Amino acid sequence: MKRDHLFYYGTLASALLPVVPACAKTKKGNASVDNRPQPNVIVIYADDLGYGDLECFGATRVQTPNVNALARSGIRLTNVHAIAATSTPSRYGLLTGEYAFRHAGTDIARGNAGMIIRPEQFTMADAFKNAGYATAAIGKWHLGMGDRDGEQDWNAQLPMHLGDIGFDYHYIMAATADRTPCVFIEQGHVANYDASAPIEVSYTQNFEGEPTGKENPELLFNLKASHGHNQSIVNGIGRIGYMKGGGRALWKDENIADSIAAHALGFIREHREEPFFMYLATNDVHVPRFPHDRFRGKSPMGLRGDAIAQFDWTVGQVVSELERLGLRQNTLIILSSDNGPVVDDGYADRAVELLGDHRPAGPYRSGKYSTFEGGTIVPAIVSWPKRVKGGQESDALISQIDWLASLGSLVGARMPKGSAPDSQNRLGTLLGEEKEDRPYVLEQAANHTLSVRTREWKYIPPSKGPAIISGPGIESGYSREPQLYDMRRPYEQENVSLQHPDVVFRMQAYTEQERNKGASYTSPISK
């Protein structure tokens, strides 16, 4: 499905308006597509969006009307946990149903990492595909491209890409907006490829004659770094990693949300007469936060608040298109985030200065990277008007690791033996039809610490590391002593491990039980 890549290069808000006439045919045969037994499914996966970053989860310094409406139309889930406190391991677990700690090479991925999910593995996309769905991944990827680390030829068809793991269509960022290469990948090719500017990427050394943020700070005309992010400069912003070339294929950060939204709407239109699954992973609100001009000033919190408003707009675009095509009633939308929030993650965007009384993690302690609850508890909304009654709220304990098995069950997917080894079918809880807690969830911090959370308790095992993570200035939760917190009390303030040795023992047993299951798959990739 080839698309016009004009979306990178201009405001082109008009390009996002519906291009199919309002009276367009939305029936297949005599049956309305909205009355098919299989729902369309869209997972909207935000980046670094905290529990307290949305109005419907308590935010007062940013307006999120589209997300608020989505919550009113369905169920607000208040006890959902990402699989890890950082991006790559959370996304790996979500899409494979396997905890990332079982699989080598699932730390925060470089932009030239090889495919972390291998073709032999069963994925969420595979589940939908074998149930007869059209499948797509659009937006942030951060799970590697090509066969092996650092061996990609970005000027040719990548030998291994998302088409090999169940996605019929993909339009993705190779890693994140702050890492090279700063191009989109569509169907295994660099999108809008410019043959006059061949692409080279390195994470070990710069290319001769190419400026860097460290040596040429005068070229950082859009955003300067607060820490790190001082290697290659693209669009006046320093990045992690080095690259050369790109030309017309290079993105402009202010147009990333437009481009992602446009391709998402295009996929919906193209597949409106068949069931489809879309993994829509936004760049917002990850750094560098550089939203389009039309979102500037939407929040008193500066660029971070404006990026939240831009995320809300993306949600509104998707919902509006579904409504226009007559698909909204039978489309299941799940909205959540890959990990907790971070305020200063490497750019001088005044996010700390302008935060005011906003609490990105809501009532929870710390944020991204951390073992504390703010690292992994995330906002979540489920909306499916045909089946899920609106205006609900559930505090059932839920882990994103279970979404593959749950959604596979919903659509009648054939799940091969041994696939999604950590994913449990908890569809009833996800849809608000039951309030049953998961017995426990595992939460992986940036230093690989595996915490255990039940409804009442949070156990953090001893680990090494600084109390404060330098750069973002986040409390790590790392301690050489075991920590046990009663989650019925606020903010993980009192370590009660000595008072409750029986609970500590039980929580340790959960961790050992999971570790002893071992890895189900060993990647041939050299890391």
What are these language model-derived features?
Residues 488:
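Flexible catalytic loop/linker elements that gate and position reactive groups at enzyme active sites
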